Design a protein with these regions (language model features):
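Short, basic/aromatic recognition patches
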Residues: 75-95, 233
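Residue-level signal for inorganic ion chemistry
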Residues: 83, 101, 167, 207, ...
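Short beta-strand scaffold segments in enzyme catalytic cores
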Residues: 100-106, 245-246, 459
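Zn2+-dependent cytidine deaminase-like catalytic core
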Residues: 106-222, 308, 341-347, 403-405
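Active-site ligand-binding patch in enzyme domains
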Residues: 138-150, 232-236, 240-249, 253-390, ...
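Short gly/pro/ser/thr-enriched loop/turn and capping motifs at secondary-structure boundaries
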Residues: 195-198, 221, 290, 317-319, ...
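Flexible, gly/pro- and Lys/Arg-enriched active-site loops
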Residues: 406-445
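Conserved histidine-centered catalytic loops in small-molecule metabolism enzymes
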Residues: 433-498
Length: 498
């Protein structure tokens, strides 16, 4: 199986135009370290210093990796924040491509903006240039030949603010660098640097060679956070893992008798479906399947993308009539059952069951066992990565969460806490397993952030070296609030696009 992609409706809330490069949407400046979004890196120290200056409205100057000085002021930060807000709109739709936003500005006024809306469709830069033409009445679309100007001459001398360095290679469509050059863009302001080794900075080089001024690392930390999934996947070739659970105020995920519906309220449960929409795959253990018979689908008020469903089932106990298996013949998202059972042994009953499951559209994935005879988390992640799965939401149960934490595979954790006390020594907690033998061996999750969802609290934890996917709603809303506040003060020349 060459790759797995999330099935998506033809249209959600977003409109789209054009085609996208099937591999990376943008490739960037050379990264010397594996994870470009590590908060402790030197590059992010520059970015955070710059962000602090932006907040004070002061110019910031620092060297980028090409050795050139980078200067930007409060206006640059403001327009980049708008590009970030636009980029978040593609969350859940662009995988395995990155999230990218672009704003075109001339003389302090926004003349075009766009974002990478869906995998297989136009990139942010071409959408923004096409928007320039639409706003000026110059044509109905930016779907032009590779060397044509999507902006129809409307972007001459303008500045393009892009959250990720523009791509410079040819895939399903020409490079975005060519579109920016053809449009007569005079300056490109870049937020993040792409760790994709295919181009290693050639995008900025191509723009500079064409006489375009390029300033990098504007709001670098915030732009890096946009693409923590993409950066992790492009450098590690394994999914970015988010562990999630819901619990009572005393740390219980169910009553002693097993009743767990519902710990949290409707607002928290709706937020879980946002996570399912944004991440490429969802994982549970066979115990959850046997107890709850779930579908593991994304159910939002508006159409969402559906995650690939993964069940850890070391002994292939999954019922052939369960909701997950039945849904495979109804056009639902792909279902992968990861097992250590001897499915390759033709004489084994497991082999016959695996064939029956396969005939119904289930992929039975044979995975090496760990020391305890369970599905090896590290082997599973490598196999999912080879199938193009760039992110994984681990929803439990407690044994599965323990396996991922014990394997050191969790990039981020999300806990929904309800104002209830369940009590009872036998009531389960979120993470099972042997546990830490002493406090020094406990898994450190780093500083927490929180959101209030109805009566519940959402806690988001990112271990050192990881950015936060689950907090993206908060970031996007803050970016929009900043923009509207600036507009109220007369600083923003136009309102954000709807």
């Amino acid at each position: 199986m060459a790759g797995i992609t999330k099935p998506q409706p033809q249209k959600g809330n977003e409109s789209a135009a054009g085609e996208a490069v099937a591999a990376s949407a943008c490739d960037g400046l050379t990264q010397q370290t594996g994870n470009a979004c590590a908060p402790g890196s030197t590059q992010n120290a520059h970015a955070n210093a710059a962000d602090a200056d932006d907040a004070r409205g002061k110019p910031s100057t620092f060297a980028n990796s090409a050795g050139a000085g980078c200067e930007h002021d409060a206006d640059d930060a403001r327009f980049m924040r708008r590009a970030i807000e636009l980029a978040w709109r593609g969350a859940g739709w662009t995988s395995p491509n990155p999230l990218v936003g672009c704003v075109i500005v001339r003389e302090g006024r926004v003349i075009g903006e766009g974002w990478h809306e869906r995998y297989g469709q136009a990139h942010a830069e071409r959408n923004a240039l096409a928007d320039c033409a639409l706003r000026s009445g110059q044509g109905a679309s930016g779907q032009l030949a590779s060397h044509d100007d999507p902006a129809h001459g409307c972007a001459q001398g303008a500045t393009a603010y892009v959250t990720l360095e523009p791509c410079c290679h040819t895939g399903k469509q020409p490079p975005c660098t060519e579109a920016l050059i053809a449009a007569g863009i005079a300056r490109v302001v870049v937020g993040s640097r792409d760790p994709n080794p295919l181009v290693a900075g050639k995008g900025c080089e191509a723009l500079r060679a064409a006489g375009i001024r390029v300033d990098a690392d504007v709001l670098r930390a915030a732009c890096d956070e946009l693409n923590s999934v993409f950066f992790h996947f492009i450098t590690h070739k394994t999914p970015y893992v988010v562990a999630k659970w819901a619990m009572s105020a005393d740390g219980k995920i169910a009553c002693a008798a097993g009743d767990a519906r519902w710990i949290t309220g409707p607002e928290a449960r709706a937020d879980v479906h946002e996570l399912r929409h944004r991440l490429a795959a969802i994982c549970v253990g066979i115990g959850t399947v046997l107890a709850d018979d779930p579908l593991l689908t994304c159910r939002r008020d508006t159409p969402g993308s559906q995650p690939v469903r993964v069940v850890l089932d070391s002994r292939l106990r999954i019922p052939e009539d369960c909701a997950l298996v039945r849904s495979c013949s109804e056009g639902a998202a792909p279902l992968i059952v990861a097992t250590c059972a001897p499915v390759a042994d033709e004489a084994s009953p497991d082999a016959a069951k695996a064939k029956r499951l396969a005939s119904r559209g289930v992929e039975v994935l044979s995975v090496a066992p760990d020391a305890a005879g369970r599905v090896s988390v590290s082997h599973l992640l490598a196999m999912l990565g080879s199938r193009g799965v760039d992110s994984l939401l681990v929803e439990g149960g407690a044994g599965v969460l323990a396996a991922f934490f014990e394997a050191g595979a969790v990039n981020e954790a999300v806990a929904y806490v309800a104002p209830k006390v369940i009590g009872g020594a036998e009531a389960p907690s979120p993470v099972a397993g042997k546990g830490a033998p002493c406090m020094a061996d406990a898994v450190a999750l780093g500083r927490a952030t929180s959101d209030v969802l109805g009566d519940d609290v959402k806690l988001m934890f990112a271990p050192a070296g990881s950015a936060r996917v689950a907090s993206q709603t908060r970031i996007a809303l803050k970016a929009a609030d900043d923009w509207h506040a600036s507009a109220a003060e007369g600083g923003a020349p136009c309102s954000p696009a709807s």
